[in-house]
Amino acid sequence: VKCRINSSTYRPVISAQLPFRYAVYFCPAPDSNWGLAGAQWLGRCAITGKKDTQPQFSDIDSELFHSITSDPRRYGWHATLKAPFKLVPEHEVGDLLLKMHQLAKSLKPFDLPKLEVSTTGGFLSLRPREVSTPLHAAAAMFVRDLQSFALPLNDAELARRRKAKLTLEQ
């Protein structure tokens, strides 16, 4: 399945969790091949809320599979472009949304290379098998150009992140 990423698929989604944190995620359109595959894998589309029948595997109990996909089923099939952050007091949500929209519109369409299953911090993820310059450039753009909106991490948050032993790329 080919994934074509372009700015026309951009749609901001705000989650009202307290304390407010914001992040930038790429979520495939619910009716795209990627969106349909993700909804089936997780058993639910986070964008539409529509439930889906999860696949059955001979090597894993269906209740166990349903259980281990419960957290991702809630937040959905996505790719993180900028990790969650708290908004600095100098900016309002509207400023952030405007900047996100401008950045998304500046993206040129690109295809992802083949993906492989990987484990990252205890999570299963799909990662490119080879370096994708446009993907890295898009993610770097969101991280770099939205950093002025992010409140610096406090000591406890820094300690938690350091304990996670993130890779240099992360």
Predicted regions and their residues:
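Basic, often amphipathic N-terminal segments
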Residues: 10-120, 137-170
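Short, conserved secondary-structure transition motifs
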Residues: 119-131
